[in-house]
Structures are given as C-alpha cells and as structure tokens.
C-alpha cells in the first residue's frame, strides 16, 4: 500500500485584493468586513496593486483569523518566492462581453413577495434591482459573461477557456466546458443548472470543484449543483 495519497478536495476560499500597504487601514477595513460575516478560518489568496511587506501582511491576516494560502503572481511574486510562499499564476485577461438581453426586477424594501419588471424607471433608495442576463450564443474561448446583480441564463453552451460569473443563479441550456461561478460575493443559496456538465471549474459562493474532482456519474449529464448544509457542493443528476 502506498504511503502517499493525493486526493482532490473542494475548498472554500476568498481572494483579497489590497490597494493600500498601510496596515492600520487594512486592519480597520478588514475588521469591518470580518464583523459582517463568518469569515474566521477562511483560506485566502492575496493579491495587491501596490508593494507590500509580505511577511508582515501575512502575519496581520493570521492575527485576524484568516489563513493565507498563496499570492497572485505580479507585484508580490518575487517576494513570495524569496520566502518560499506559494505563488499562483496571474489571471489571463478575458474579453468581457455584453449579454443578448437583460431583464430588471425591482423589489421594494422591506422585501415583499411581489416584484415588478422595470426597464427604464430609476431605482429609489428603498428599492433593490435583481437583473437577469440572457445570452443566445455559445460563449467562446476567451470570453467572459458577468452579472453581479442577479442571474445568468445561457441559451447555448460554453467552450473551454470561457467563463460565466453571477451573483445569483446560473442556467445553461447546453454543454458546459468552461468555468461556472455562481453566488459570487458570497450568496450561498445560489444554484447552477446545466444540460451537460464538462466544466473546467464550478463554484458557488467561493466553494469550488475542478474538473478532475467532479463526480463521474454526473459528467456529460444534466446537473443541478448547490451547497448543502455543510457548505459542500452537491451534484444532483437531473432526469430530463
């Protein structure tokens, strides 16, 4: 029997991007963010647009209950390598495209069971917009479709190297071969529905699963993906 085993695991992580190297400011702003949710023990990836004292920054994050895992290559790359801290490749730029159409639902606060569909009426201070983006064409390699205020519905599939990101649910009526990210921003109730699952990555509210770890019984099948009570991804095969 082998003494070493490598297994895949779905990990909940967050990416933190710093636009300042003032640790007092970082501590204050992070404290406000951490007080708003249950982030204690969260694994984090560090990105920065400015120079940092990386060791001090890592120590600061640890002291606040976070678990730094790696940095994004770029400004911090050389410093991380010098201390043998993991470095992840920088993001490849994708072409962000516009959806074929959008529908805006205006929900008055306090939330009621009714929502009215609006297209031109401006929002007031007591209203929340939920936007559904519709796209009729296949999402091609290098393209990204993003909706940070609601759901996305793809009426065709998506190619490898493409990406779809929504703060809410994602419905794909075709084959999925790219990256599908629902619940962006932490919406754990978000769900993913697709007609044929061959994704490079699926994620809901930061909990992700790469292609090799997707359960074999749902590959190339209609699938419903959601987070269970333990905040783990569940893959439910659908009968169509």
Swiss-Prot record:
UniProt superkingdom: Bacteria
Keyword Electron transport: no
The keyword Secreted is assigned to this record: no
Keywords: Cell cycle, Cell division, Septation
Any single GO BP term: cell morphogenesis
Complex and partners: Interacts with MinD and FtsZ.
PANTHER family in the record: SEPTUM SITE-DETERMINING PROTEIN MINC
Family, similarity comment: Belongs to the MinC family.
Described function: Cell division inhibitor that blocks the formation of polar Z ring septums. Rapidly oscillates between the poles of the cell to destabilize FtsZ filaments that have formed before they mature into polar Z rings. Prevents FtsZ polymerization.
Name this protein carries in UniProt: Probable septum site-determining protein MinC
């Amino acid at each position: 029997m082998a003494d070493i085993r490598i297994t895949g695991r779905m990990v909940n992580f967050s990416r933190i991007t710093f636009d300042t190297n003032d640790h007092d400011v970082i501590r204050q702003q992070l404290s406000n963010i951490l007080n708003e949710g249950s982030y204690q023990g969260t694994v984090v990836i560090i990105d920065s647009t400015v120079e940092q004292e990386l060791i001090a920054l890592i120590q600061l994050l640890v002291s606040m209950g976070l678990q730094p895992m790696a940095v994004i290559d770029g400004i911090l790359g050389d410093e991380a390598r010098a201390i043998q801290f993991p470095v992840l490749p920088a993001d490849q730029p994708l072409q962000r495209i516009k959806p074929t159409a959008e529908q805006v639902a205006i929900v008055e606060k306090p939330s009621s069971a009714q929502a009215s569909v609006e297209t031109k009426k401006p929002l007031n201070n007591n209203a929340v917009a939920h936007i559904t983006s519709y796209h009729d064409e296949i999402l091609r390699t290098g393209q990204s479709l993003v909706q940070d205020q609601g759901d996305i519905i793809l009426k065709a599939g998506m190619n490898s190297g493409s990406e779809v990101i929504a703060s809410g649910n994602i419905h794909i009526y075709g084959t999925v071969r790219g990256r599908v990210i629902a619940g962006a921003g932490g919406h754990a109730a978000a769900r993913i529905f697709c007609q044929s699952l061959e994704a490079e990555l699926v994620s809901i509210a930061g909990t992700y699963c790469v292609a090799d770890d997707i359960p074999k019984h749902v590959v190339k099948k209609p699938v419903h993906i959601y987070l269970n009570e333990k905040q783990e991804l569940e893959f439910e095969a659908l009968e169509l």
